[in-house]
UniProtKB/Swiss-Prot annotation:
Taxonomy, superkingdom: Bacteria
Free-text function comment from the UniProt entry: Catalyzes the formation of 2'O-methylated cytidine (Cm32) or 2'O-methylated uridine (Um32) at position 32 in tRNA.
Subcellular location, record wording: Cytoplasm
Classification via Pfam families: SpoU_methylase
Residues that, per the record, bind S-adenosyl-L-methionine: T79, S80, A81, G114, I134, S141, S142, L143
Organism annotation: Salmonella choleraesuis (strain SC-B67)
Catalytic activity: cytidine(32) in tRNA + S-adenosyl-L-methionine = 2'-O-methylcytidine(32) in tRNA + S-adenosyl-L-homocysteine + H(+); uridine(32) in tRNA + S-adenosyl-L-methionine = 2'-O-methyluridine(32) in tRNA + S-adenosyl-L-homocysteine + H(+)
Enzyme class: transferase
Keywords (A to Z) from UniProt: Cytoplasm, Methyltransferase, S-adenosyl-L-methionine, Transferase, tRNA processing
Gene that produces this protein: trmJ
Designated name of the protein: tRNA (cytidine/uridine-2'-O-)-methyltransferase TrmJ
Record note on quaternary structure: Homodimer.
Database matches in InterPro entries: Alpha/beta_knot_MTases (IPR029028), RNA_MeTrfase_TrmJ/LasT (IPR004384), SpoU_MeTrfase (IPR001537), tRNA_m1G_MTases_N (IPR029026)
Length: 243
């Protein structure tokens, strides 16, 4: 189950942080590390700071885009320390651990951490089902990357241990939620339909798509429900072609 949980680092700029993150992961039983467009490649410093978790570094998946790192996942949680202009469904670390473990019983889950200095962009955060914030001391809330990973990884492990003790891991119903790939295709289909009907304009889309993403993220449609929505969009397109 824990192998289904990906720790995704976006554009990491210090190899030492990669090693420290690998160490934080392995102490909690997590080994699935993804590096999105790292500004530096793992080196001897990363191995040194991994302190026995060099296998996590050696097996890390290095990809060019966040979409590649999220492919095949049914749940994506992004870390965010800042209040956003467009509020998003929020979790605390404990809720994040519980949700991640529940879903990882069936499909991959991605926990996404941003750049050391500026975190994740708004566009990247909008690819997430939830945002997670760590309730640090407001007078000094500066956690480095490995610290943030350690906090979330600890809560994941606590949630996983609870399932082992309660015997909940033996029998899980298949999760009905669509994968991130399917959701992105739906959003593309929705945007194209709204453009073709004139509801939004290509050069001036405003916040419509962002707000619709938030709406569907909050509602979190199941796979069958998403198929119904795609069918509705296809029907609208067919009607437009007949005019």
């Amino acid at each position: 189950m824990l192998q289904n949980i990906r720790i995704v680092l976006v554009e990491t700029s210090h190899t030492g942080n990669m090693g420290s993150v690998a160490r934080a992961m392995k102490t909690m039983g997590l080994t699935n590390l993804w590096l999105v467009n790292p500004l530096v490649k793992p080196d001897s410093q990363a191995i040194a700071l991994a302190a026995g978790a060099s296998d996590v570094i050696g097996n890390a998946q290095i990809v060019d885009t966040l979409d590649e790192a999220l492919a095949g996942c049914s749940l994506v949680v992004g870390t965010s320390a800042r209040s956003r202009t467009l509020p998003w469904p929020m979790l605390d670390p404990r809720e994040c651990g519980l949700k991640s473990v529940a879903e990882a019983a069936n499909t991959p889950v991605a926990l996404v951490f941003g750049r050391e200095r500026v975190g994740l962009t708004n566009d990247e955060l909008q690819k997430c089902h939830y945002h997670v914030a760590i309730a640090a001391n407001p007078e000094y809330s500066s956690l480095n990357l490995a610290m943030a990973v350690q906090v979330i990884a600890y809560e994941v492990r606590m949630a996983w241990l609870a399932t082992q003790e309660n015997g909940d891991a033996a029998d899980h119903e298949e999760m009905p939620y669509p994968l991130v790939d399917d959701l992105e295709r739906f959003y593309g289909h929705l945007e194209q339909t709204l453009l073709s009907t004139g509801f939004i304009r290509e050069n001036h889309p405003g916040q419509v798509m962002n707000k619709l993403r938030r709406l569907f993220t909050r509602a979190r449609p199941e796979s069958q429900e998403l198929n119904i929505l795609r069918g509705i969009l296809a029907s609208i397109e067919q009607q437009n072609k007949g005019k």
